């Protein structure tokens, strides 16, 4: 059997393969990873790499004892928007709830007005800046939702901007677009049934026909969409080949998780108000539970998703930033990992697996989120030697080198390089 001809090798590493289940990061100390082109060609012991891999012509990175993981998969983001909601943040700091602000004319309505008024170039530039901040922290795959246009023409415009974002990043990250039904447009609040009917008959088929999205997501919540409305939208999307997902049980127990199980959604995200029946439904249907602890922190709540109960019930979990202007205005990967441990009670290994393999599962991307022969060569070298350190040293960017499809797309300055041995 011929040796793989490596184009990139990371040596002297602690490799986390993230392919051994939800609670095992698959740590391999004293290890190396060899990449051939866009794929992982070999993973094994450092002492074997020279005998088993052709290193002639390969770019070699000495990890110096640092942790090498799969590229992070941020499976839930809202990067395309304009404007700010800092004033709303101050109101919530003074005691108003998210729902109270929304019902008084704030919330999504504010972002919708600003986003509709912004030109494409402004929206693209802002989204690209947010994506670049995530890439610099080890994210190599991003799900990006529409949702702030609300009506059909604006939602189509936002999805086209998401596609432009992928091109603007030049292959430095994979962008997976989602059509999000966030709320009924203000122009159609008097005819909710008509809006849903038109979306099923026109918007969703056009999105599918033009291949503008891979997923369709619905916010199932008081003031957004009822389960019966969401069922119609998601079934129409599923019939057209889009993968259904839901925002579920974030602010109230609205039945979104059971709907996700019924429809075979790839994920049900948020879940702060999830009950035992919802957990059982997700477990039986093998729907991924999307954990978004930055949102809970940002909204000033102490009611986090029941992550431990989900894991104990056998529900697969993912971890994501939920970067958005209303409930998680942050791209901080390190803080997300730390909150997963401190508030969701995940172990550091579980948090890392959820942010890699879990995200890949939520997005139905089997070649992502793991370090294994044949998998996509999306890798991160961190300036520490363990998942525990990543979560312990809070809100810090530990990413030293980020690799996408076998190509270094981000590298920290030399002064940031550390020896972890």
Swiss-Prot record:
Transmembrane segments: none
Gene3D superfamilies, alphabetized: Metal-dependent hydrolases, Urease, subunit C, domain 1
Protein residues bound to 4-imidazolone-5-propanoate: 85, 148, 182, 250, 327
Keywords associated with the record: Cytoplasm, Histidine metabolism, Hydrolase, Iron, Metal-binding, Zinc
Any GO MF annotation of the entry: iron ion binding
Catalyses which reaction(s): 4-imidazolone-5-propanoate + H2O = N-formimidoyl-L-glutamate
Pathway membership, UniProt: Amino-acid degradation; L-histidine degradation into L-glutamate; N-formimidoyl-L-glutamate from L-histidine: step 3/3
EC class of the enzyme, as a word: hydrolase
Keyword Zinc in annotation: yes
Localization in the cell: Cytoplasm
GO BP annotation list: L-histidine catabolic process to glutamate and formamide; L-histidine catabolic process to glutamate and formate
Cofactor annotation comment: Binds 1 zinc or iron ion per subunit.
Homology family: Belongs to the metallo-dependent hydrolases superfamily. HutI family.
NCBIfam families documented for this protein: hutI
Summary of the function given for this chain in its UniProt record: Catalyzes the hydrolytic cleavage of the carbon-nitrogen bond in imidazolone-5-propanoate to yield N-formimidoyl-L-glutamate. It is the third step in the universal histidine degradation pathway.
Name of the protein this chain belongs to: Imidazolonepropionase
Organism of derivation: Anaeromyxobacter dehalogenans (strain 2CP-C)
């Amino acid at each position: 059997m011929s040796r793989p001809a490596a184009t990139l090798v990371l040596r002297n590493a602690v490799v986390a393969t993230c392919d051994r289940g939800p609670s095992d990061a698959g740590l391999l100390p004293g290890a190396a990873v060899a990449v051939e082109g866009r794929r992982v060609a070999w993973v094994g012991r450092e002492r074997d790499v020279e005998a088993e891999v052709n290193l002639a012509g390969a770019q070699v990175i000495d990890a110096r004892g640092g942790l090498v993981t799969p590229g992070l998969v941020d499976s839930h983001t809202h990067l395309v928007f304009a404007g700010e909601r800092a004033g709303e943040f101050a109101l919530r700091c003074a005691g108003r709830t998210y729902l109270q602000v929304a019902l008084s004319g704030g919330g999504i309505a504010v972002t919708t007005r600003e986003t509709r008024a912004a030109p494409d170039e402004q929206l693209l530039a802002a989204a690209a800046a947010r994506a670049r901040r995530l890439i610099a922290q080890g994210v190599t795959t991003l799900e990006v939702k529409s949702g702030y246009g609300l009506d059909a023409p604006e939602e189509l415009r936002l999805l086209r901007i998401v596609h432009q974002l992928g091109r603007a990043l030049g292959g430095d990250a994979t962008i997976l677009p989602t059509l999000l039904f966030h709320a009924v447009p203000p122009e159609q609040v008097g005819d909710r049934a008509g809006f849903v009917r038109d979306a099923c008959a026109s918007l969703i088929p056009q999105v599918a026909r033009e291949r503008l999205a891979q997923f369709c997501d619905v916010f199932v919540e008081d003031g957004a969409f009822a389960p019966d409305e969401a069922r119609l939208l998601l079934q129409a999307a599923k019939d057209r080949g889009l993968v259904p997902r839901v925002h579920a049980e974030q602010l109230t127990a609205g039945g979104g998780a059971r709907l996700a199980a019924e429809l075979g959604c790839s994920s049900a995200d948020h879940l702060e108000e999830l009950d035992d029946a919802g957990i059982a439904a997700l477990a039986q249907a093998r729907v991924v539970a999307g954990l978004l602890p930055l949102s809970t922190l940002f909204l000033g709540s102490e009611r986090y998703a029941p992550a431990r109960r989900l894991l104990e019930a056998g529900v697969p979990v993912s971890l994501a930033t939920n970067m958005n202007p209303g409930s998680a205005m942050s791209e901080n990967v390190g803080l997300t990992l730390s909150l997963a441990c401190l508030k969701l009670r995940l172990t550091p290994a579980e948090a890392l697996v959820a942010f890699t393999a879990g995200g890949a599962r939520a997005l139905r991307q089997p070649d992502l989120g793991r370090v294994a022969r044949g998998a996509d060569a999306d890798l991160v070298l961190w300036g520490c030697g363990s998942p525990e350190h990543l979560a312990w040293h809070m809100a810090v960017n530990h990413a030293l080198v980020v690799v996408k499809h076998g190509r270094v797309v981000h590298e920290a300055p030399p002064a940031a390089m550390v020896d972890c041995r």
